[in-house]
Amino acid sequence: MKKLILSLVTVATLCGLAVQAEDKPKTETNVSNPSNDEVAVITTVEGTMVLEFWPDVAPNHVENFKKLAKSGFYDGTAFHRVIKGFMIQGGDPLTKDDSKQSQWGTGGPGWKVKAEFNKKSHVRGVLSAARSQDPDSAGSQFFICHDRATFLDGQYTAYGKLIKGDEVLEKINSTQTGPQDRPVKKMTMTSVKIVPRAEALK
């Protein structure tokens, strides 16, 4: 399995979003009637974040995330890539296994989701799909913007936003990192649940 890195150029800064590569994956499309009354509750070693979804602009990405979360796919994964002032990235199932650290950033669910580029801007707290150079290569990996990153607009599929737990985003983004922007302390997501909005915000 080949690790793919998509380089992003903004002014004189070169940033990379490591994404998964799957061998001849099938494509998930045509999801019908996703609901917007559910949110994602991501419990991490640094606290809990709640994210709302935008099914009106990215229905397939929303439903893909929900399906993976409801199956327990994300439980025990980690935010394996943290770039201060930019974003935190997670969703790779390989991060459950510390013996596979050299492969972190290459894992996925075994299928791809076609791009749903939209007019939502990549500002702080926005949830977006990580991908390779192929626009239709998103799978399970995602990132949450720590700061405005409008140079990603129209190139990455934004499909939700942080609505509770901004201090947790700050803690994770501030953690010490080493080579490959990997946190020194493992930023594990102990659970990722899909629950009614009212329940998550009470």
Feature map (PLM): residue ranges:
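Cyclophilin-like peptidyl-prolyl cis-trans isomerases
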Residues: 4-8, 16-202
